[in-house]
């Protein structure tokens, strides 16, 4: 599938670049070599390369050179209740590049009952005009019927979308039923697409929200109190179950709790094709801030599923990410201003949900996982770039340093230290949930489409230069096992002769019996006769009809060795 063209959008001219003296880090190996790039592609890798004149040389001085990051979960320029997130595609992708990310995958969120295709085209128009780096799109399924099914099929086959998200929460807005979940997973599995889920039990959340408000809890702490992690875990388990029944690969977005992460880990060990996506927030910070006395600060952390109030959760999730039980990372970058958040100042259920994280994602993971010895540099590349490229069928064009791959590269300094502050981040949001954190590891140089985007701490970006990258269905990384299981899972009826015995006539149901066609009771157990209360056996004389009949609960004492009345069956 080729790149999609755009009209009247400035194109960047790729530089001829030579990176010398760097240590190339892929997900499976690290080695020293030089890299020559031209026309936005990697042309040569090796020592003593022969390159044309006029090449710009970048001295890596032994620093790591790795594939540019891929942020698989963003919400740039997203409309919400008459508002729009403060970071549009220009500001959002600019922040991404500042943190070492050279491609993002944004979520298209159609209004309920509206066209998925029209929403997709709207997102394309916004992103084509403003994105500074390459991008792809997920499409969220916010309602379900035959018309939506046809749109999903068209988006998958014609529009370069291979992932669709459904919501198990947001009752009466986006939430799908279990039956719809089954139908959607079946459809996506047939298309070779990836089923993503926002996993929370929306029915229970609605009840808990009402209970919190009745108790007078209206602040941001009500958000986490009404969404305990058990509700995330229950939905994850349910989604895994439905995905297994439909033989559809499952992708759990925003893994926020230990319980949810454990369920994904256990399911993978049992052979389920399921992927888990923790986000910058769940990897870098906890939910104790919901109880801050400063309402604006507490509200800045409101996202769903909520951050866990257990302060050991980020370390735990980083460990599972390092071990491969969770496979990749996103940021779920969805920023609202404090004034926008304040529409819920008297009711936590009205606070717009979302946090920052696109710029901080790679440094947070390096600081929390690599610098602490949980994962090595190759695993870091896997969870920030390569696994995403494999899952969404972008590999090896993205996510790898190899001849023929896109020249999206990052020269990474593991010793660099930066202190996060809203005063100097690229996001428009006036608050940063990682404020004051000292993070080890940062990009020195960022190259996207063969063009230097970040150098010496200065950004050089071009609005609208980002390309839409279509994602083809049936990714081998995702579907190889699914295809094999389909061949093995063909169901066949048992060959047997025709039954020619007696058949009970349901039309002659006795008076007082269960009406024909009733589904009450077990279909395999005959229903006991219904007692006619007008023909009661109770007598005032003291002698009853059932006198002498042993009660089922009455114990009979048998002699040693037991008492037998069984006759021979021979």
UniProtKB/Swiss-Prot annotation:
Bilayer-crossing residues are none
**Keywords of this entry:** Cell projection, Cytoplasm, Phosphoprotein
Q: How does it assemble?
A: Homotetramer, and heterotetramer with CRMP1, DPYSL2, DPYSL4 or DPYSL5. Interacts with synaptic vesicle protein 2 and SH3A domain of intersectin. Interacts with FLNA.
Q: Where is this region: Disordered?
A: 506-570
Query: What lineage does the source organism belong to?
Result: Eukaryota, Metazoa, Chordata, Craniata, Vertebrata
Going by the entry's taxonomy, the superkingdom of the source organism is recorded as Eukaryota
Q: Which family does it belong to?
A: Belongs to the metallo-dependent hydrolases superfamily. Hydantoinase/dihydropyrimidinase family.
Q: In which tissues is it expressed?
A: Isoform 2 is expressed in growth cones. Up-regulated in motor neurons during axonal regeneration after sciatic nerve lesion. Overexpression of isoform 2 increased neurite extension and branching. Isoform 1 is expressed throughout neurons and their axons.
Q: Where is the signal peptide?
A: none
Modification type Phosphoserine: residues? 259, 518, 522, 536, 539, 541
PANTHER family, per the entry: DIHYDROPYRIMIDINASE-RELATED PROTEIN 3, HYDRANTOINASE/DIHYDROPYRIMIDINASE FAMILY MEMBER
Q: From the Swiss-Prot or TrEMBL record, give the protein name.
A: Dihydropyrimidinase-related protein 3
Q: Which Gene3D superfamilies match?
A: Metal-dependent hydrolases (3.20.20.140), Urease, subunit C, domain 1 (2.30.40.10)
CDD domains associated with the record: D-HYD
* Entry's Gene Ontology cellular component terms: cell body; cytosol; exocytic vesicle; extracellular space; filamentous actin; growth cone; lamellipodium; synapse
User: In this record, what's one Pfam family?
Assistant: Amidohydro_1
Q: Name one GO biological process term.
A: neuron development
Composition bias, Polar residues: 506-524, 533-544
Q: Name one GO molecular function term.
A: SH3 domain binding
């Amino acid at each position: 599938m080729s790149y999609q063209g755009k009209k009247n959008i400035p194109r960047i001219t790729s530089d001829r670049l030579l990176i010398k003296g760097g240590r190339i880090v892929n997900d499976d190996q690290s080695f020293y070599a030089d890299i020559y790039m031209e026309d936005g592609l990697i042309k040569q890798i090796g020592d003593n390369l022969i390159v044309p004149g006029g090449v710009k040389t970048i001295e890596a001085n032994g620093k790591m050179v790795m594939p540019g990051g891929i942020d698989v979960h963003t919400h740039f320029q997203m409309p919400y209740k008459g508002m729009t997130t403060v970071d549009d595609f220009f500001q959002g992708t600019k922040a991404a590049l500042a943190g070492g990310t050279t491609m993002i995958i944004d979520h298209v969120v159609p209004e309920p009952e509206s066209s998925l295709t029209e929403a997709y085209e709207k997102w394309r128009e916004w992103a084509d005009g403003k994105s500074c780096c390459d991008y792809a799109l997920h499409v969220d399924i916010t309602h379900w019927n035959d018309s939506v099914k046809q749109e999903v099929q068209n988006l998958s086959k014609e529009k370069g979308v291979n992932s669709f998200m459904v919501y198990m929460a947001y009752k009466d807005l986006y939430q799908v039923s279990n039956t719809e979940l089954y139908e959607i997973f079946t459809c996506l599995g047939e298309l070779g697409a990836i089923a993503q889920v926002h996993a929370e039990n929306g029915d229970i959340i609605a009840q808990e929200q009402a209970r919190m408000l009745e108790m007078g809890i209206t602040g941001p702490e009500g958000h986490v109190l009404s969404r305990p992690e058990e509700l995330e875990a229950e939905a994850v388990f349910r989604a895994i179950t439905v995905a297994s029944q439909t033989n559809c690969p499952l992708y759990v977005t925003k893994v926020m709790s230990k319980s949810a992460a454990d369920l994904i880990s256990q399911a993978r060990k049992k052979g389920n094709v399921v992927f888990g996506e923790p986000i910058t927030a769940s990897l870098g910070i906890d939910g104790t801030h919901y109880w801050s006395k400063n309402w604006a600060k507490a509200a800045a952390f409101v996202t769903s599923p909520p951050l866990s109030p257990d302060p050991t959760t980020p370390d735990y999730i980083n460990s599972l990410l390092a071990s491969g039980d969770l496979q990749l990372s996103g940021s779920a970058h969805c920023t609202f201003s404090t004034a926008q958040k304040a529409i819920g100042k008297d009711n936590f259920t009205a606070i717009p949900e979302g946090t920052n994280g696109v710029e901080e994602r790679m440094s947070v993971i390096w600081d929390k996982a690599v610098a602490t010895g949980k994962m090595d540099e190759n695993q870091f590349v896997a969870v920030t770039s390569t696994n995403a490229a494999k899952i969404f069928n972008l590999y090896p064009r993205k996510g790898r340093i190899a001849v023929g791959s896109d020249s999206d590269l990052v020269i990474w300094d593991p010793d660099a230290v930066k202190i996060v502050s809203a005063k100097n981040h690229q996001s428009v949001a006036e608050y940063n949930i990682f404020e004051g954190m000292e993070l080890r590891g940062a990009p020195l140089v960022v190259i996207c489409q063969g063009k230097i985007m970040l150098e010496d701490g200065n950004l050089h970006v071009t609005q609208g230069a980002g390309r839409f990258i279509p994602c083809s269905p049936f990714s081998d990384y995702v579907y190889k096992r699914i295809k094999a299981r389909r061949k093995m899972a063909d169901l066949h009826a048992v060959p047997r002769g025709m039954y020619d015995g007696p058949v009970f006539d349901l039309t002659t149901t006795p008076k007082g019996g269960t009406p024909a066609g009733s589904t009450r009771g077990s279909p395999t157990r005959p229903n006991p006769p219904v007692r006619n209360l007008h023909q009661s056996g109770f007598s005032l004389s003291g002698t009853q009809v059932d006198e002498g009949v042993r009660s089922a609960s009455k114990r009979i004492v048998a002699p040693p060795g037991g008492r037998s009345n069984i006759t021979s069956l021979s």
